[in-house]
């Protein structure tokens, strides 16, 4: 991460489930700290739980829902 790359802070409001071939990715719903009315679904690699703050390098793309 360099100084030129803008990051967006988002708070995990709900853990939706595990995905990936071995369950190594967690699907979460996040709410942006700058705009609390805006929420999206993202895939997160590694340990994550509710109320964690994520630094999103890219904040426009939304993950597909679990089946």
From Swiss-Prot:
Keywords assigned: Cytoplasm, Ribonucleoprotein, Ribosomal protein
Single GO BP term: ribosomal small subunit assembly
HAMAP family on file: Ribosomal_eS28 (MF_00292)
Subcellular location: Cytoplasm
Disulfide feature: none
GO molecular function list: structural constituent of ribosome
Organism: Candida albicans (strain SC5314 / ATCC MYA-2876)
Lineage top rank: taxon: Eukaryota
The encoding gene: RPS28B
Any one of the GO CC terms: cytosolic small ribosomal subunit
Record function comment: Component of the ribosome, a large ribonucleoprotein complex responsible for the synthesis of proteins in the cell. The small ribosomal subunit (SSU) binds messenger RNAs (mRNAs) and translates the encoded message by selecting cognate aminoacyl-transfer RNA (tRNA) molecules. The large subunit (LSU) contains the ribosomal catalytic site termed the peptidyl transferase center (PTC), which catalyzes the formation of peptide bonds, thereby polymerizing the amino acids delivered by tRNAs into a polypeptide chain.
Lineage: Eukaryota, Fungi, Dikarya, Ascomycota, Saccharomycotina
Name under which the protein is recorded: Small ribosomal subunit protein eS28
Pfam families: Ribosomal_S28e (PF01200)
Alphabetized PROSITE patterns for the sequence: RIBOSOMAL_S28E
Oligomer status and interactors: Component of the small ribosomal subunit. Mature ribosomes consist of a small (40S) and a large (60S) subunit. The 40S subunit contains about 32 different proteins and 1 molecule of RNA (18S). The 60S subunit contains 45 different proteins and 3 molecules of RNA (25S, 5.8S and 5S).
InterPro entries: NA-bd_OB-fold, Ribosomal_eS28, Ribosomal_eS28_CS
Family to which the UniProt record says this protein belongs: Belongs to the eukaryotic ribosomal protein eS28 family.
């Amino acid at each position: 991460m360099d100084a030129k790359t803008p990051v967006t802070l988002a708070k995990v409001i709900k853990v939706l489930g595990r995905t990936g071939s071995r369950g190594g990715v967690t699907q979460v719903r996040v709410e942006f700290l700058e705009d609390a009315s805006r929420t999206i679904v993202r895939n997160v690699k590694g340990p994550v739980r509710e109320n964690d703050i994520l630094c999103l390098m890219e904040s426009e793309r939304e993950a597909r829902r679990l089946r």
